[in-house]
């Protein structure tokens, strides 16, 4: 059975802000099933922000598991991410889940993959999903050549991705943390 998929998630850390934003489109094959999905949310007492790309049902399962890991590890983002990645890699049921998570708190920005990888990207710039390469290119140019805030860069990067990627729309959800 074909999965619901396609999205763009972009995260930027600049100054005393970290921002994660995502579009709202859910596609099944070449059909838009929903245009206002919420793929970015706050977790663990509003201290962590997270976004997902990939299968929608899979991502919600992973959000629940990740939040449980955050609870059991006192909100320690890196430790919770590593523990989730271990489970994701070794648990038979979880291993079939197809999604990527972008997570951030006041100290770190991470990508968690189903291969068991926990990646802290260069420059604290994360771009995942079908429009990720477009959003990343736009964000990198804006980071290097402007003084825009993290939120403004996320908004512009997602807009550019939505202009180019057929699986990304302009209905944006953006969450930010200040520290």
Curated annotation (Swiss-Prot):
EC number: 3.4.25.2
PROSITE patterns documented for this protein: PROTEASOME_BETA_2
Protein activity control: Allosterically activated by HslU binding.
Keywords, comma-separated and alphabetical: Allosteric enzyme, Cytoplasm, Hydrolase, Metal-binding, Protease, Sodium, Threonine protease
Gene Ontology BP, a term: proteolysis involved in protein catabolic process
GO cellular component terms listed in the entry, alphabetical order: HslUV protease complex; proteasome core complex
UniProt subcellular location: Cytoplasm
Signal sequence region: none
Cytoplasm is among the record's keywords: yes
Domain of life: Bacteria
Molecular function GO terms recorded: metal ion binding; threonine-type endopeptidase activity
Residues forming the catalytic site: 7
Major site of localization recorded for this protein: cytoplasm
HAMAP family: HslV
Family according to the record: Belongs to the peptidase T1B family. HslV subfamily.
Function, in words: Protease subunit of a proteasome-like degradation complex believed to be a general protein degrading machinery.
Name of the protein: ATP-dependent protease subunit HslV
Organism: Teredinibacter turnerae (strain ATCC 39867 / T7901)
Lineage, top ranks: Bacteria, Pseudomonadati, Pseudomonadota, Gammaproteobacteria, Cellvibrionales
Gene: hslV
């Amino acid at each position: 059975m074909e999965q619901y998929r396609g999205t763009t998630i972009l995260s930027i850390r600049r100054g005393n802000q970290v921002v994660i934003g995502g579009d709202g489109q859910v596609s099944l094959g070449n059909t838009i099933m929903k245009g206002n999905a919420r793929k970015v949310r706050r977790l663990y007492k509003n201290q962590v922000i997270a976004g997902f790309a990939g299968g929608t049902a899979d991502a919600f399962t992973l959000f629940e598991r990740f939040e449980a890991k955050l609870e059991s590890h006192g909100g320690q983002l890196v430790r919770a991410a590593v523990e989730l990645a271990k489970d994701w890699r070794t648990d038979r049921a979880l291993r079939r889940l197809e999604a990527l998570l972008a997570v951030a708190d006041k100290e770190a920005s991470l990508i968690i993959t189903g291969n068991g990888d926990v990646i802290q990207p260069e420059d604290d710039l994360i771009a995942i999903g079908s429009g990720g390469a477009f959003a990343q290119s736009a964000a990198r140019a804006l980071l290097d050549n402007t003084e825009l805030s993290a939120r403004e860069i996320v908004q512009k990067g997602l807009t550019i991705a939505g202009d180019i990627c057929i699986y990304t729309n302009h209905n944006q959800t953006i969450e930010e943390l200040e520290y």
